[in-house]
């Protein structure tokens, strides 16, 4: 059986869910780390809703709430995305993912550091590329939306 690359996405809101969905469709094993009481503007397209409902669905992809990181292989084997309540990101240490993507969109860094994985990416303001994370992605509407920032801030 082929070993898939594991990635962690911090945050399961609507924008994060777009990233999660795309990574899943590209064949990555994605673990979503969510807070205890997530909020999202577009709740029907947010994997974070699994925290409340046990499951969430975004374009026919299922997110499933788990209570322990040891449940990940079973959920991945079912073709689903595990959602774990782990606001502090403690499970990053034990899972050792290839990349950590911070998609919390808190407009400030809530603890993501470059030493969490070989590749770290953050969405939106509050991060400095090459200091806090490797890359920052611009999330503000306009001509620079989606731009990858290699040095500096969004």
Regions found by a protein language model. Give the residues of each.
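Well-ordered secondary-structure scaffolds
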Residues: 2-154
